[in-house]
Amino acid sequence: MHKFTVALDCDEVLNNLIEKTLELYNARHSTKLTLDSFTDYDFYKCLSFEEAEDLTAMFLEKELWDSLSPAPHSQWGVKTLIDKGYDVYVATATHHTNFPWKVDWIIKNFPLIDEKHIICIHNKSLLRADVLVDDCAENLISTSPLVDRICFDKPWNRNVYDDAYHIYRAHNWEEIVEQIDTCYKDSI
């Protein structure tokens, strides 16, 4: 029997990478950037070139990954999905230099996710999951409409009209779990 497969993005789904990066960035540069400053997934469209360069370079710093916490209720959500029998994967589009730190972070904070279930993939349309949960609208839009897609609400994806793309929107982990349950029930 087919096990219902869930692919979860890491950054901004399992963690709040942007918020933590902004915290460190603001401390270093005496700025007051907030999450709402990011109205586009492409930082270069909503920040100055220098700010975008500095901020994206920080993603490659081990210090960031060492200080990063899981997103609220994400550990509960992952445990709940696994306890319900879903086959849970982490599918992350990441730079190869920080992939080891990210894998270590996932293993430390989500020990129920098997290391073999952590995938580095830039083109998420290649995934063969039943559900994809992501904050990047482009990843969701490019994925087959045969895959249930859940957009984790962030300022940079609010321009995506869920009905136009048949994408569900979730504002928290409780809604993610509820929507995955609905997708599963609709598939049987």
Predicted segment positions?
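Metal-dependent phosphoesterase signature
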Residues: 33, 39-79
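Substrate-recognition "cap/lid" segment bordering the active-site pocket of phosphatases
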Residues: 91-142
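Acidic, Mg2+-coordinating phosphoryl-transfer loop and its flanking beta/alpha structural elements
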Residues: 133-171
